[in-house]
């Protein structure tokens, strides 16, 4: 089939809260981007059909190729989302949507593919020197959950992406304050993973733990209705609520620890890339937050980490971009 006949391609980036859809009408050209709330639809197929009906006027041809990035491990045909109610069969969904091929990949595999094609203005660098060519790149990011993957670019330019579930590693507190936060979480959960703190709901959990800290009983606190990640972040930045600022500082410190752990584990001299929608909302604060200092606080390996740049991904739809690149790679090489 001529390459032009594979367009438009149906792309999706499906997280725990939102599903983003787009149509790739030409290489790296994505149109008709829509964001739908997962809770508004009984199933993935229902959401896709609704999306396609909204884009009906833009569709000259029905898509026959699709690529969906989903926030869950892919272990066969049956897919169960980690942080929402959707479950689906890849093959049944392909047939239901009249697609010739439906590629389904982990969302942070898509993020890794997207990073392979990013320009300098798509990224905000936080410390470090420069990336080492062909060295592993670590990709992680807090959102509804916490995703982790690895990107390796070989000397011939080919890409290898290693998916993982690093967000579910056990969290290790760094200091007495984080021990207090961990103990609060441990009273609620049998397993306290990094994702428990480094996610949208994690901001709320950190706030709740800190609000019970001795000496903070009389500090101004949020009402129950205000206890959301967005409001905690806003109050932290405007300076009205010191406990919110402490919450955000603690969040960034914890993220620095995890990012350093991942970088050391992978030998990520190619850089660390932070994805997701949370950090770009407060990027100016993040540049001077405790993140970078904590990232480099690794004893004998501090100098090793000091040279590694951390990049915050500022691009709006990297998940869709990566889903498109993964599909292109599949169609060219019949592999990803």
From Swiss-Prot:
* Compartments where found: Cytoplasm
The entry's cellular-component GO terms read: cytosol
Lineage in the entry?
A: Bacteria, Pseudomonadati, Campylobacterota, Epsilonproteobacteria, Campylobacterales
Q: What family name appears in the similarity comment?
A: Belongs to the bacterial glucokinase family.
Predominant cellular place of this UniProt entry's protein:
cytoplasm
**HAMAP family found in the cross-reference section:** Glucokinase (MF_00524)
**One Pfam family, short name please?**
Glucokinase
Annotated catalysed reactions: D-glucose + ATP = D-glucose 6-phosphate + ADP + H(+)
Q: What is this protein called?
A: Glucokinase
State the EC number(s): 2.7.1.2
Q: Which residues does ATP bind? A: 12-17
Disulfide bridge map: none
Show which residues constitute the signal peptide: none
InterPro entries, alphabetized: ATPase_NBD (IPR043129), Bacterial_glucokinase (IPR050201), Glucokinase (IPR003836)
What is the protein's species of origin?
Answer: Helicobacter pylori (strain J99 / ATCC 700824)
- Does the UniProt entry include the keyword Cytoplasm? yes
Q: Which top EC class is named for this enzyme in its record? A: transferase
Answer whether the UniProt record assigns the keyword Ribosomal protein to this protein: no
What GO biological process, any one, is recorded here?
glycolytic process
Q: Any idea which GO molecular function terms this record carries?
A: ATP binding; D-glucose binding; glucokinase activity
The record's keywords, sorted A to Z, are: ATP-binding, Cytoplasm, Glycolysis, Kinase, Nucleotide-binding, Transferase
Gene name on record?
Answer: glk
């Amino acid at each position: 089939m001529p390459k032009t006949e594979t367009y438009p391609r149906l792309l999706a980036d499906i997280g725990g809260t939102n599903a983003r859809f787009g149509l790739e009408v030409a290489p790296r050209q994505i149109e008709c981007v829509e964001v739908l709330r997962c809770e508004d639809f009984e199933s993935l197929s229902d959401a896709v059909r609704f999306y396609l009906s909204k884009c009906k006027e833009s569709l000259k041809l029905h898509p026959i190729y699709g690529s969906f990035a989903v926030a869950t491990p892919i272990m066969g045909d049956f897919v169960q989302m980690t942080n929402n109610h959707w479950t689906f069969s890849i093959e049944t969904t392909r047939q239901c949507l009249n697609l010739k091929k439906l590629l389904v990949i982990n969302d942070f595999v898509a993020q890794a593919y997207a990073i392979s094609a990013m320009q300098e203005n798509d990224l905000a660098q936080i410390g470090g020197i420069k990336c080492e060519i062909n060295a592993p790149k670590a990709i992680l990011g807090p959102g509804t959950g916490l995703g982790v993957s690895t990107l390796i670019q070989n000397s011939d330019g080919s890409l290898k992406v290693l998916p993982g579930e690093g967000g579910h590693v056990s969290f290790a507190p760094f200091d007495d304050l984080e021990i207090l936060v961990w103990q609060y979480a441990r009273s609620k959960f049998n397993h306290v993973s990094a994702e428990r703190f480094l996610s949208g709901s994690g901001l709320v959990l950190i706030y709740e733990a800190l609000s019970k800290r001795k000496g903070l009983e009389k500090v101004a606190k949020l009402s129950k209705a205000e206890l959301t990640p967005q409001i905690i972040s806003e109050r932290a930045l405007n300076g009205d609520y010191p406990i919110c600022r402490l919450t955000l500082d603690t969040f960034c410190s914890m993220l620095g620890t995890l990012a350093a752990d991942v970088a050391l584990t992978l030998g990520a001299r190619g850089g660390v890339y932070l994805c997701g929608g949370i950090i770009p909302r407060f990027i100016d604060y993040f540049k001077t937050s405790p993140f970078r200092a904590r990232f480099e606080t690794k004893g004998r390996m501090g100098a090793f980490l000091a040279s590694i740049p951390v990049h915050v991904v500022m691009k709006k739809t990297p998940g869709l971009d990566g889903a498109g690149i993964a599909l292109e790679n599949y169609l060219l090489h019949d592999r990803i």
